[in-house]
């Protein structure tokens, strides 16, 4: 009788430990890569935007758009505090104030700058996905990475913004 009680207690108290540890908070803080080149697909304000994103920390961010067709070929480049908008052979330098604050390129830039500044806070790891929280002017951003620190997804609460990155490569080689 006592043996059965011990087995039941063991199952009730030891088994949950194995089940709960599948997704846990890891104390080691894996560093997010802020220099990369990737393809992206972003749901932004009920619009699907695709293109290529390259970032080198806060030095250079380039967003080249493939779709929708109305913006295909448009490229937005942030070089420090300078902004360039280009399409085909036309390049226009502008002040960042000309881009609306909650626009797709500006939200993307602010999140990537926050990552480069080290403001993303590690929240946990589940299997091979690490999750970070980043407080921004647009609300709470959730950044997901693989186990090597390569960004795979960015979403922003309070904005209709969810970006999925694919074919992510290190910009440093």
Each PLM stretch: what is its role?
Residues 55-114, 159-162:
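An acidic-aromatic
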Residues 28-36, 40, 86-138:
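Flexible, processing/modification-adjacent segments and terminal tails
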Residues 62-69, 74, 120-173:
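Gly/Pro-enriched, hydrophobic low-complexity segments
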């Amino acid at each position: 009788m006592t043996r059965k009680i011990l087995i039941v207690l063991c199952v009730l108290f030891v088994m949950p430990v194995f089940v709960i540890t599948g997704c846990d908070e890891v104390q080691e803080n894996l560093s997010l890569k802020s220099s990369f080149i990737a393809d992206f697909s972003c749901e932004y304000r009920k619009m699907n935007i695709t293109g290529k994103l390259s970032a080198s920390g806060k030095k250079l961010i380039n967003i080249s758009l493939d779709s929708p067709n109305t913006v295909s070929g448009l490229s937005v480049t942030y070089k420090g505090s300078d902004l360039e908008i280009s399409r085909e052979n036309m390049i226009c330098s502008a002040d960042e104030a000309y881009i609306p604050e909650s626009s797709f390129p500006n939200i993307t830039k602010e999140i990537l700058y926050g990552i480069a500044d080290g403001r993303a806070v590690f929240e946990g790891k589940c299997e091979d996905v690490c999750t970070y929280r980043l407080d921004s002017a647009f609300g709470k951003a959730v950044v997901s990475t693989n186990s090597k620190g390569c960004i795979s997804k960015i979403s922003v609460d309070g904005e209709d913004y969810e970006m999925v990155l694919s074919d992510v490569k290190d910009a440093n080689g």
